[in-house]
A protein has these predicted regions:
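Amidase signature
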Residues: 1-80, 245-426, 434, 473-488
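Gly/Ser-rich catalytic/binding loops embedded in alpha/beta enzyme cores
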Residues: 5-192, 286, 291, 385-387
Length: 488
C-alpha cells in the first residue's frame, strides 16, 4: 500500500465514508477482504460520490440497485467463508464501447442506445471472475471516434478540474469518474490515444498494453490494428492489478530500481508545445534526473516518430467502416452501418465524412503503403531505442492542456495560437498506437491554470511488465497531482 492509500485508510474509522473515496482499488479490496468495511458500505460511498459529481456526465447508465445488490452478495460470500477474488466487491465503471450483458452498450451513439449484448466482453468476464462489480457504463466520444468526449447525443463529458473543459477522449467518462473519486479503477479502450489523453487531462494514470495482451472480443472496433482495451486508475499498483488479471499473468511486478534506468526524450514529440505543457513536463524530467534516472535527449535519430500519427490516421480511416459493420453483424445489433451513420452527431459525422467515407476513403494503395510504413517505423523505433539503450521513451501525451468544450477542430492556447486538433491531440499519442508500444501515462504536474499535464512513458511491444515496473518507480518520484476540489 502506498503512502496516499495508507493515509486514506487510517482516516476511515474517524472521518466516515469520505476517506474511502481516496483508497486505490488494491487497498480497498484488501480492506474489504479483511472485513474492515463492507462492500455495501464502499459501494454506497462511491455511488454517493457519483451523485455529487452528476454534472460531469461521466455515466451513460448507472444501476444503483444492481450495484448494491451485488455488493451485498459479496459481503454474504465473505461471511460464509467463500473464496474471495482479487477484485472482491470492487465497483468498476466500464466504457460504453465494451460489451456488458447486464447493461446496454451504446458506444455513445443514438442508434445503439438499446443494444443489449448477449455476452460480456472477454475482459469483463475476467474481472467478474475476480469479484468485480460493473458499476455502470461511462459516457464517451460518439463511436469512440474522437478525442474530446463532446457527445452531441448524450451530452458532453466534463473535466473535474474545470467543467468548461474536456476530459479528453474517447474514454472521457471513465477518466472523469476515476479522477472525481467515483471509483478507483475503470475499464477504457484506446485506438489512438483514448486511454492516454483522458489520463493526462484528468490527472490520473492510464495504461495502453501491447497489442493482444488482453482479450479484445466484445469491444466495438475502429481498427483491427490499433484497438486495445486497458485500465485507468489513480495508482499504478491498480494498473498492475488489472494487468495481472486481464493478461492472465499471476507473476508479481515490483518497482524497477532507478539505478541504471534510461529514459529517452525524442525531440520531435517535444516540438511546438503549449509553453505551459512544456514547462510542467520539463520540470518532471528534471525531478527524474535529480533522483538518478538517466534522461537522454535525442535530437537526431527517432525524429521520424512524428510521422506515426499520419500513418495511424490512414489505417484507421481505411478500416473503420468495415470494422464497425462487421461488429454490428456478428453481434446482432439490429443496425446496419448506414443506419448508424444517419443518426450521428454533427462533429462525428463531419470527421467521418472528412476521413472515412468517399471520396476521402484511403485507396487500397495508400492503405497498403501505410501498413508498410508502420512496419518500417516500428523497426526504426526499436533500433533507435537499442542504440540509446533506452528503457522507455518519454514525451507529453498531448501538445496542449485539456481543450475547452467545443474545440473540436483546433485548440487555442495562451497567446492566441490555435493548433490543429490532429496535431494538438493526435500527434504524440500516434506513436504508441502505430508501433504497438506498451505505454503508461503518469501525471507530471499542473499548469498555471490548474489543469493537469501527463507524460507518456512508452516501451517496446511486449515490454508491458517492464513498463509497469518502471511506472511504479516513476510514480513515486513524480508524486502525482492534487485531486479535483472536494464536494460535500
Amino acid at each position: 500500500m502506498d503512502k496516499d492509500n495508507a493515509e486514506c485508510f487510517t482516516q476511515v474509522a474517524s472521518s466516515g465514508d469520505a476517506a474511502l473515496l481516496g483508497l486505490g482499488a488494491a487497498a480497498a479490496v484488501a480492506a474489504m477482504q479483511r472485513g474492515e468495511f463492507t462492500a455495501e458500505r464502499y459501494a454506497t460511498a462511491l455511488l454517493e460520490q457519483a451523485d455529487r459529481w452528476r454534472d460531469l456526465n461521466a455515466f451513460r447508465t448507472l444501476d444503483r440497485d444492481a450495484v448494491l445488490q451485488a455488493a451485498r452478495a459479496a459481503d454474504e460470500r465473505r461471511r460464509r467463508g467463500g473464496a474471495l477474488g482479487r477484485l472482491h466487491g470492487l465497483p468498476v465503471p466500464v466504457k460504453d464501447s465494451v460489451n456488458t450483458r447486464a447493461l446496454p452498450t451504446s458506444n455513445g451513439t443514438l442508434s445503439l442506445s438499446g443494444f443489449r449484448p448477449s455476452a460480456d466482453a472477454g475482459v469483463i468476464g475476467l474481472l467478474g471472475e475476480e469479484g468485480a462489480i460493473v458499476m455502470g457504463k461511462t459516457n464517451l466520444h460518439e463511436l469512440s471516434f474522437g478525442w474530446t468526449s463532446n457527445n452531441e447525443t448524450f451530452g458532453a463529458v466534463r473535466n473535474p478540474y474545470d467543467l468548461a473543459r474536456s476530459p479528453g477522449g474517447s474514454s472521457g467518462g471513465s477518466a472523469a469518474a476515476v479522477s472525481a473519486r467515483m471509483a478507483p479503477l475503470a475499464v477504457a479502450e484506446d485506438t489512438w490515444g483514448s486511454i492516454r489523453l483522458p489520463a493526462s487531462f484528468c490527472g490520473i494514470a492510464g495504461f495502453r498494453p501491447s497489442r493482444g495482451r488482453y482479450p479484445d472480443d466484445g469491444i466495438m472496433p475502429l481498427s483491427r490494428h490499433f484497438d486495445q482495451v486497458g485500465p485507468l486508475a489513480r495508482f499504478v499498483e491498480d494498473l498492475v492489478l488489472f494487468d495481472r488479471i486481464a493478461a492472465r499473468d499471476a507473476r508479481a511486478i515490483e518497482p524497477r530500481p532507478v539505478t541504471g534506468m534510461r529514459v529517452a526524450v525524442p525531440a520531435a514529440l517535444w516540438a511546438e508545445l503549449d509553453p505551459e505543457v512544456e514547462r510542467v513536463a520539463r520540470h518532471a524530467l528534471a525531478r527524474l534526473r535529480e533522483a538518478g534516472v538517466s534522461v537522454v535527449e535525442i535530437a537526431g535519430s527517432l525524429n521520424e516518430v512524428a510521422r506515426a500519427a499520419g500513418i495511424v490516421g490512414t489505417i484507421v480511416a481505411a478500416e473503420l467502416r468495415g470494422s464497425v459493420a462487421d461488429f454490428l453483424r456478428r453481434h446482432d445489433a439490429g443496425v446496419a452501418f448506414d443506419d448508424l451513420y444517419a443518426t450521428l452527431g454533427s462533429n462525428t459525422k463531419n470527421l467521418m465524412d472528412a476521413m472515412v467515407l468517399p471520396p476521402h476513403t484511403p485507396t487500397r494503395e495508400a492503405y497498403e503503403a501505410a501498413l508498410r510504413e508502420r512496419n518500417a517505423l516500428a523497426a526504426s523505433v526499436a533500433a533507435g531505442m537499442r542504440e540509446h539503450r533506452a528503457d522507455v521513451l518519454a514525451f507529453p501525451v498531448a501538445m496542449v492542456r485539456a481543450p475547452r468544450i467545443g474545440e473540436e477542430t483546433g485548440v487555442t492556447i495562451d497567446g492566441g495560437r490555435t493548433i490543429d486538433a490532429f496535431d494538438a491531440l493526435g500527434r504524440n499519442v500516434g506513436l504508441g498506437s502505430c508501433v504497438g508500444m506498451a505505454s503508461i501515462v503518469l501525471p507530471a504536474g499542473r499548469a498555471d491554470d490548474g489543469m493537469p499535464v501527463g507524460i507518456e512513458f512508452a516501451g517496446l511491444p511486449g515490454g508491458d511488465r517492464d513498463v509497469l515496473a518502471i511506472g511504479l518507480s516513476l510514480e513515486r518520484l513524480l508524486g502525482g497531482v492534487e485531486p479535483p476540489a472536494v464536494r460535500a
